């Protein structure tokens, strides 16, 4: 969950988010070095009064400023392609969830369990208890086991939505009439907050996502209690 005045990314709670943060830092270093080099060249050009009236062409210089940017782009593209593969790879998930976007709430279906489905609405500010985050808490949390491969099928019943949980590195569009899938692996137990990230109408800001990650035995107990209610 993001903190007040936080400037950086949220703490990673999945291997995918760890890789995304690493790629962000790696790319930022390259961009910083390029920015310093460009500003140094501009400053030298402004400050220096030396000119060369006989300098008409420079094949070597043109080769250098063509090859070096190409090499830099390759060094950025390779880890980026690796990340794209990891995002799309689904390897034998233990649990499959279907997340359906509505105006303006989410509903969840556990495909591996019969009759395990519910709607998840934001709790109004007046009904919050002490310690609950405003505009982020819901009446029914999505309970998932930690240390388990999970697949989520995302769709919508009306307009475009987007199912997003930043600390897990997840953002998947919910498109009417189409099933998109995303996979993740939660590294630790805890509460992970997200929101719809696609403008979907008047109450777009009021359809949060809350994932409660628990150990596997607690998850089995939760499923048993839910089905017995």
From Swiss-Prot:
PROSITE patterns: COX2, COX2_CUA, COX2_TM. It is found in: Mitochondrion inner membrane. It is a multi-pass membrane protein. Keywords: Copper, Electron transport, Magnesium, Membrane, Metal-binding, Mitochondrion, Mitochondrion inner membrane, Respiratory chain, Translocase, Transmembrane, Transmembrane helix, Transport. It comes from the Eukaryota. Cu cation A2 binds at residues 196, 198, 200, 204. Its cofactor is Cu cation. Its EC number is 7.1.1.9. This is Cytochrome c oxidase subunit 2.
